[in-house]
Curated annotation (Swiss-Prot):
Belongs to the purine/pyrimidine phosphoribosyltransferase family. Keywords: Cytoplasm, Glycosyltransferase, Purine salvage, Transferase. InterPro entries: Ade_phspho_trans, Adenine_PRTase, PRibTrfase_dom, PRTase-like. It catalyses: AMP + diphosphate = 5-phospho-alpha-D-ribose 1-diphosphate + adenine. It holds the Pfam family Pribosyltran. One of its GO terms (cellular component) is cytosol. Transmembrane segments: none annotated. Its EC number is 2.4.2.7. Homodimer. This is Adenine phosphoribosyltransferase. It comes from Pasteurella multocida (strain Pm70). It comes from the Bacteria.
Length: 180
């Protein structure tokens, strides 16, 4: 692991038994408290995508906003929000997806993505891939083309990367953590 990735990984605190027994919560808020680590995340994403022809960066509620917005600014492209129901003021479409116990729904403005758009999805963490799969479906329903999905953290034991690959989308992740 190079020094940049080591800085990122060491800045992420692991909180055992949160939000429930047996789960280790990977806390990116501790990374945000280390400006050099936060800047490194943004810089690594920008370096990877600056020559890829991305036309929109999309962030998923809510921690995807933290990393997606500065990347969009650096790439000089619009930043698009994907939110929980009822949070976006203009006309939206929604996509429901399954959780371990139940389901959730995401929404996007219908005029945010167009047929020619090459979209980069950014979120903080890739676990099972359910949230990002729903986000991909929203983009595709609006005619956009998801080029890639980028995450600060990957939990490879939960299978999210394979789920994205099955959709024909590469996952770019900076650091891996074992377990849940």
């Amino acid at each position: 692991m190079n020094d940049k990735l080591a800085l990122i990984k060491s800045s992420i605190k692991s909180i055992p038994n949160h939000p429930k027994e047996g789960i280790i919560f990977r806390d990116i808020t501790s990374l945000l408290e280390v400006p050099a680590a936060f800047q490194t995340v943004v810089d690594l994403f920008v370096t990877r995508y600056k020559e890829k022809g991305i036309t929109k960066v999309l962030g998923t509620e809510s921690r995807g906003f933290i990393f997606g917005a500065p990347v969009a600014l650096a790439l000089n492209v619009p930043f698009v929000l994907v939110r929980k129901p009822g949070k976006l003021p203009r006309e939206t479409i929604s996509q429901t997806y399954q959780l371990e116990y139940g389901q959730d729904t995401l929404e996007i403005h219908t005029d945010a993505i167009h047929a020619q758009d090459k979209v980069l999805i950014i979120d903080d963490l890739l676990a099972t891939g359910g949230t990002v799969e729903a986000t991909v479906k929203l983009v595709q329903r609006l005619g956009g083309d998801v080029q890639d999905a980028a995450f600060v953290i990957n939990l490879p034991d939960l299978g999210g990367e394979a789920r994205l690959n099955a959709l024909g989308i590469d996952a770019y992740t900076l650091v891996d953590f074992a377990g849940h």
